[in-house]
Amino acid sequence: MTRYAEITGLILAGGRAQRMGGIDKGLVPFMGKPLIEHAINRLITQAGPILINANRNHDQYAQYGYPIVADAQADFAGPLAGFAAGLTHCKTEYLLTIPCDSPLFPLDLSQRMHQALLDTQSDLVFASSQDASGAVWAQPVFCLMHRRVLESLLSFLEQDGRKIDRWFAELRSTTVVFENEAAFANTNTPDELRALEHAQGYAN
């Protein structure tokens, strides 16, 4: 039984993946397993219920045994549409979102973000990563939010809002800085995927 039963985990796999050639990114192999499997394996100890946000290939995603939630908005409306789909189906106090294409995300992501949310009484906490030079980079799709933000998000989307940072600015939000920048490496292109496999010592 997870310590985080009050947190629903949402894997964002609903994008168009244009830079991956339009292939459904969650089903692309990484180190011998689809990216969605890596996401599930890292999330399963950090959340209670798990949802998968997908807008195609529902039958293939359903094989993993978790509910599939599609965007209400048409035409691949971006991660905020995925957030809205997850919040609409979220039955717990909090929703933790992660993208399907960052297979090395921190195993203490949920714990640290949950603590920050409680400490600051925020509506929403997002991750940031710090590189070797000390520069901090926002990682906004790694996000823990209270389910009460759904109304705000739906209103933002109805006004054709798409930019995550603009929606965050409407809420009480804060960030947690993770020093391991590599944990947030993503795989937007086939070359990035192969480079990340190589960095992990994987030889196909």
Residue ranges and their predicted role:
Residues T2-G161, R166-A185, P190-N204:
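Nucleotide and nucleotide-moiety/phosphate-recognizing core
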